[in-house]
Amino acid sequence: MNYDVIIIGGGHAGVEASLASARMGNKTLLISMLAENVGATSCNPAIGGLAKGHLVREIDALGGEMALITDEAGIQFRILNQTKGPAVRGSRAQIDMDRYRVIARNKILNTPNLELVQEMAESLIIEDGEVKGVKTNLLNEYSAKRVIVTSGTFLRGVIHVGEIKQIGGRYGEQSSDALSASLKSCGLEMGRLKTGTCARVDASTIDFSVMEEQGGDELPNPFSFRTNREEFRKTKKQIPCYITYTNQNTHDIIESNFYRAPMFTGQIEGRGPRYCPSIEDKINRFRDKERHHLFIEPQTLENTECYINGMSTSLPPDVQQLMINSVKGMENAKIVRYGYAIEYDFVDPRELKHTLETKKIKGLYLAGQINGTTGYEEAAAQGLMAGINASLSLQGKEPFILRRDEAYIGVLIDDLVTKGTKEPYRMFTSRAEYRLLLREESADTRLSHYGHTFGLIDDENYERVKAKEAQIQEGARILRETIFTPNKEFIAFLNSIGEEGVRDTISAEQIVARKSFDVSKMLKLIPEFEMYESYILDEILVEGKYARYVQKQSEEIQKMKKYLKVEIPQNFAFRSISGLSKEIVEKLESFNPPTLQAASQISGITPAAIEILHIYIKIDIKNRNK
């Protein structure tokens, strides 16, 4: 049984990797332990969020499926951080978890060149440092030129619920111990991480009337640029989430049972996600907090079960029931599924190239939680990139590597492969130095030309993106070139829309840059913009408001590209540089990087440190040439 590409694991990374591979013309096999769980959302019933929404839109722009599935399975859509700048706003959707999985599986089953088989991959076939295929638990051998491992939390997975430990990669499913051993035998450095999930509660036993209702946006925006926006808004049915809070009684119940918490007893060894702590960890670390938010999220459109966001736990079942019942609105709530923690093996992502191919084994790619990340979106992004790069390598083409100034996906992969991680890695807008250039709404105009080149975005959708980009550029040009003089009529106009007058000649771009200027005012200033759709107007306004900042950031990028090529002189005296911390100096001395590019890839070396180093290198060269 011969294939071009084999993907091991049918989670979010596996779905994107297998679809990309098959659509790029490769005979592809997806191996999954349970065929019905392909595309399953193991934890929260939501896609997107701050920075994660950026990833979903970038996946979409490159031709991935996550956004399209979310638009179809979504039951509530919101833009987070709406009052903040456009660079840090994030789209988030509640999804029908059952529907999401069905849609994902159907896409897999109906894609040409792609086969799905329910088996457990147990070992990799390696010959002379190159992957040749996969052996399964049913003693089948599948040959392939490229293999992508997207194993999620299944590598030597151990589930913890109070004092109880059991082997499993997800509750009710087996772990993959043999595959973990096979990866280790390849010489890959591996570690141990932990994640967790909360209890699911019978929705009919919750009193929503005493909770705060949290609805979706009145005019919901789809995730995918390929989804018809107007039709989506007309037909999309949304249901609310609810907010309640823990209280002192909740905290007392949890604290009095710390001695039974696996994360405190030493039962759990793996490090958990810093930014998604368990409720027992929150109570322990933030003892001054009188309460913590809990978001009650429906898992399906029918709302039969609710996910208690903010209450991830591995406490024993009896304690989970007590703490749930201590919360307002859940006094009579009944748990359907208990929360648990799970420990699993991961591969140090510094073992990877930027293509996500391993450095030690040719043709072997890794994507998702196996690389130390947490989150559906981070996994899907890696899966897509691995699928694309595996395909390009088979075609003898150049690898596809996104830069940090091109995409959040570029930031994600660069962080992983250059810095590694000791805890589950989550994407944040703060990780992106060039976030003004990487807004959610610009993902399609930034990246869809790549997706089109790879054959993952069709001509019709690509032409639509080009038309959008042309309209935005034309609007931005009009703002730049429309000049107003400070005469009485113009000042009176500004005053009439609640704006202060001007003393000097001014461009429309300068006027819309004012904080108080919105789309309605821009339409009065430039009436010809009435021909544009609302989402185009939003982008034109953003272009106008941030033009000078974007220009400055673009100049910084060009400057950085130029001096990253600069060589660091041999035996350079790093300790003579003022402005560098002791930690940075020690790392530079330890690694002794040959260029600024190499120095920038050392964990903990900041862009500011690179700039300082560049200045001192120029001084050193100048002194040597005297």
Curated annotation (Swiss-Prot):
Ligand binding (FAD): G9, G10, G11, H12, A13, G14
SMART domains registered for this protein in UniProt: GIDA_assoc_3
Record flagged with keyword Cytoplasm: yes
Residues binding NAD(+): 272-286
Localization: Cytoplasm
UniProt keyword terms in alphabetical order: Cytoplasm, FAD, Flavoprotein, NAD, tRNA processing
Protein name: tRNA uridine 5-carboxymethylaminomethyl modification enzyme MnmG
Superkingdom to which the source organism belongs: Bacteria
Function, as annotated: NAD-binding protein involved in the addition of a carboxymethylaminomethyl (cmnm) group at the wobble position (U34) of certain tRNAs, forming tRNA-cmnm(5)s(2)U34.
Pfam families, alphabetized: GIDA (PF01134), GIDA_C_1st (PF21680), SAM_GIDA_C (PF13932)
NCBIfam families on file: mnmG_gidA
GO cellular component terms given for this protein: cytosol
Cofactor(s), names only, from the UniProt record: FAD
GO molecular function, one term: flavin adenine dinucleotide binding
Similarity section: Belongs to the MnmG family.
GO biological process: tRNA methylation; tRNA wobble uridine modification
Gene source species: Sulfurimonas denitrificans (strain ATCC 33889 / DSM 1251) (Thiomicrospira denitrificans (strain ATCC 33889 / DSM 1251))
Subunit structure: Homodimer. Heterotetramer of two MnmE and two MnmG subunits.
